[in-house]
Amino acid sequence: MPIQVLPPQLANQIAAGEVVERPASVVKELVENSLDAGATRIDIDIERGGAKLIRIRDNGSGIKKDELALALARHATSKIASLDDLEAIISLGFRGEALASISSVARLTLTSRTAEQQEAWQAYAEGRDQAVTVKPAAHPVGTTLEVLDLFYNTPARRKFMRTEKTEFGHIDEVVRRIALARFDVTINLNHNGKVIRQYRAVAQDGQRERRLGTICGAAFLEHALAIEWQHGDLTLRGWVADPLHTTPALAEIQYCYVNGRMMRDRLINHAIRQACEDKLGADQQPAFVLYLEIDPHQVDVNVHPAKHEVRFHQSRLVHDFIYQGVLSVLQQQLDAPLAEKDDPPTPRQMPENRIAAGGNQFARPSEAREAATRFSITSSREPAASGGSSGGASWPHAQPGYQKQQGALYRQLLDTPAAPRPAQPSAAPAELAGHSQSFGRVLTIVGGDCALLEREGSLALLSLTVAERWLRQAQLTPGTEAVCAQPLLIPLRLKVTEGEKRALAAAQSALTQLGIELHTDALHVTVRAVPLPLRQQNLQILIPELIGYLAQQNAFDVGNIAQWMARNLTSEQASWNMAQAIALLADVERLCPQLVKTPPGGLLQPVDLHSAMNALKDE
């Protein structure tokens, strides 16, 4: 067969194979054209699931008579004119393929009128060469597109269409997604002459939540957490469902938009899933409605034929931006952790440590907590304190319950009265003084946060939480050289007062030694780097608390700041297992060998089994 140019109808039908998958694809393309035309009202009429009729009527700007024939031609569009336009697309459509493709597999009629014209005109294409006929018609300002008998001339495609109910369900889903993208547009959906959906235009935030509840359901609206997150040209807004109340029905609500364009992007979904993975069960999925705004030059939408996917020029930056935004609003929903039972490693008590241990409802909020509140992102509920070493324990799916049940049995067996706390942290029981190389062998985990150790024939309980705090303090305390600073992919910018600016300037040298790089300007401070132990923390809360702590100090000692940070970091473990405990003790023995020889108060407690054994003998 010789090489030849394909007839226009055949070429359009080939293109339609990518653009027109089913009736819902037609609705999507035509409604997006209406939105690009500035429509504020769109009426959608469907018959027999879209197989018989799809009619889209809008009150947009309309199409001039001289451009009607071009509108049905391939690669004819008013939305881009140069390569520069293609590299910064702000419209929903831009290829100029939709109308030509649809008209090649259905009987399409285009009727339109502009505000400058006194009459409307109607265009339709027919025949092998897709010749366009234009004739006068009656129509208000705007455009109406009628698509009759979809796939009438491609029987093979028509056989793949599902039932009327299924096809209309896909159309309904497309309209739902569009209604969530454009709150300012009224959208009416009719099927077989019956009104199915009416989404009235809204503007205010409260009314937006009303439409959100109408589309996503009252259950999602009740547990939705609002997100308002921004960095440079990146903005993330929307709602994510509280993982504590996520159900299989809610997990079906996963709507994401990039510059107003509905997307199913794997990078975005992965970032959201990663932010929620510690709060959801293995078989659960997050529920969200999120809007990402980004510089059009930084995203390529000319990737997927149906424009369902995009490619970000800085994909890692976008991924981490979304991850941090979702993670921050979820962490603010954690209940305030209980106060730690152990005293700090040093007898000195500082008021800011009360913050990390958990909010005290009977005390006034400290300046550090007030500072954190100023910097917290918007949430639909009152945020709870997320500091402290047990911040992750509130999530029910963090660890299975076996460890807690096992710990309860051991507590009953080893119910030994606690020995009086020594006056000095350096003082330790005499029977522990001989151990200089290792804490001993880990036998099991008790209560989720203590390890039962065997130490030369005797037993002892070690607080893993306290051991982790000592390890962090050792990691944060600089030696002969400053702690290595880890640059943040997205620098954190916070507003500060004049007093806080002066405190940061005075503490600049100490913070640099600790691996914290700051830059201050007139009203803000920008955190550019932090030490490794702080990388996985919620810096939106921790840094304001640190600034509040520094503002209360008269002198800035590196050791005291490192100690404060160690006590205020959120524990990475909600409930410990054997492998984690063994790894932690190995690190403590390597970095803090003095703790093995002279355990401080609150770290290690000998267990006396004699009373339990005597009780058994008495029986």
UniProtKB/Swiss-Prot annotation:
Keyword Acetylation: no
Keywords per UniProt: DNA damage, DNA repair
Alphabetical list of SMART domains matching this protein: DNA_mis_repair, MutL_C
Family annotation (Pfam families): DNA_mis_repair, HATPase_c_3, MutL_C
UniProt cross-references to CDD domains, sorted A to Z: HATPase_MutL-MLH-PMS-like (cd16926), MutL_Trans_MutL (cd03482)
Biological process, per Gene Ontology: mismatch repair
Residue segments, region Disordered: 358-401
GO cellular component: mismatch repair complex
InterPro entries attached to this UniProt entry: DNA_mismatch_repair_CS, DNA_mismatch_repair_MutL, DNA_mismatch_S5_2-like, HATPase_C_sf, MutL/Mlh/PMS, MutL/Mlh/Pms-like, MutL_C, MutL_C_dimsub
Ranges in a coiled coil: none
Molecular function per GO: ATP binding; ATP hydrolysis activity; ATP-dependent DNA damage sensor activity; mismatched DNA binding
Superkingdom per UniProt: Bacteria
Family: Belongs to the DNA mismatch repair MutL/HexB family.
Cited PANTHER family: DNA MISMATCH REPAIR PROTEIN MLH, PMS, MUTL, DNA MISMATCH REPAIR PROTEIN MLH1
Functional summary from the UniProt entry: This protein is involved in the repair of mismatches in DNA. It is required for dam-dependent methyl-directed DNA mismatch repair. May act as a 'molecular matchmaker', a protein that promotes the formation of a stable complex between two or more DNA-binding proteins in an ATP-dependent manner without itself being part of a final effector complex.
Protein name according to UniProt: DNA mismatch repair protein MutL
